[in-house]
Each structure stands twice: as structure tokens, then as C-alpha cells.
Amino acid sequence: MTRTPTTSTGHRARPGSRREDIAAAAIELFLDRGVAATRMEDILAAAGVSVGSFYHHFRNKLSLAATVYLEHLQRFQRDLLVELDRHARTEDAVRGLVLAYLRWAGADPRAMRYLALCREPNVAEISEGEEARLKQSFYGRLAGWLDERAATGELRALPHEHSCALWLGPAEQLVRAAIDPSGYSATPDPDTLGAHLAHAERVLADAAWEALRRPALGDDADQAP
């Protein structure tokens, strides 16, 4: 039975540590070639580590691919929840999460590309249990927050999946289009991705707030809850 990698924070990689070097080299290779086509010897050569060093940190190539995915997913979700908790005002939180999503992708396009694009079936299979747990926890936090703000009358009382789609769906779609070379839009250089996404910050934040806020009496907006 295949074990699912976990995102335990018991071992934190230090800047420049061998574990970090292996992970960084592997991501570059996985993004360029795919996990299946990347050879172990290529990872070792790119990271400048020995076989022994590799197996000290990771069980095998698939474990490495899955672990790196889960760690980036956990970091992404954690950073968005930190942003959510920063704001007392509902409008600021709605807007802030959209900005945090776009800025996270712009600051670390390699990690975002890996999260969005590197989901080969054999890697997804061994990480799906932990991935499901992380996503359930993350969206559970968002759902609880949405319920609280709907109860105060500040937000529309929509099904959670509708609210999350209206809130973060446009940012997710824009990011995916920008980092996927097979997408429908021009793919900006990683060095200019942040600026590319920044141009959309206000329009997407405005759209999210307009979609989620409960219209005041007399507004022309849809009055449905």
C-alpha cells in the first residue's frame, strides 16, 4: 500500500540546505520535462547531491514530486488564511484575499506553475489523501468565515462553492492562463508576471466584492440573497 506524503513541519529546510537544493532542482526539471521523463540522475546532477543525500530526505522521485507539491499547497493556503485573518472589515478581507492570491503567484511563479500544472496521475495518486485533507481544512475555514459574515448581513448567503468561485475563481483563471504556455493568452516572462497580474488587482478585487456583498436596500444590484 502506497504511503501518502505528509506536510509535517518537523523538518524545515534551511536556506541552501541539501533538501532545499534537491526540491528546487526537481521543480525546474519537472516543469521542463514532466515527472515521468525526469531521471533520478538528472535531479542529483542539477542539485549537486549524492544518492545518499537524496534518500536521506526523500524515498524516491515520486515521493519527492508529491511532497514538494503538498508543501507548496500548504504554504499557499496558509498565506491566504493569514491575509484573511489580518482584516477586521469584511470588504477589506474579500479584496485582500484576491490581492494575496495574485501577488503570491507573481512572487513565486515557479511554485504556482508547479501547483497548477504538475499533476501527473502517478503523483496525484500518492498525494490525493493529504491534498484532500489540506483542501478540506482550507475551504472549511473560508466557509466558516463566509457564514459568519452572511449572518451579520454583510455578505450574500450563497452556497459555499458559489461564493468561493465568485471570490477566487477569476484570480485562479487569470493566473492559470498566464502561467500555462498552452493557454489562450500570452504567457508573460516570469520576471514580468507580477506586473502582469498587478494590472488586474483592482478589477478582480472590485468584482469579488460586488459579487459577494449583500446589496443595501435601494441598490440596483440583484437583491436576491
Residue ranges of model-derived segments:
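Amphipathic alpha-helical segments used for helix-helix packing
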Residues: 106-126, 176-184
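Helix-turn-helix
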Residues: 18-21, 29-63, 67
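N-terminal intrinsically disordered/low-complexity leader segments
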Residues: 1-17, 184-187, 191, 216-225
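Hydrophobic alpha-helical bundle segments that form small-molecule/ligand-binding pockets
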Residues: 82-87, 136-167, 181-188, 212-220
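Short coil/turn segments at alpha/beta junctions that flank glycine-rich nucleotide-binding fingerprints
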Residues: 32-36, 87, 108, 152
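Hydrophobic alpha-helical connector segments
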Residues: 67, 81-110, 163-167, 201, ...
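Amphipathic alpha-helical packing segments from all-alpha helical-bundle domains
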Residues: 74-77, 125-152, 161-165, 169, ...
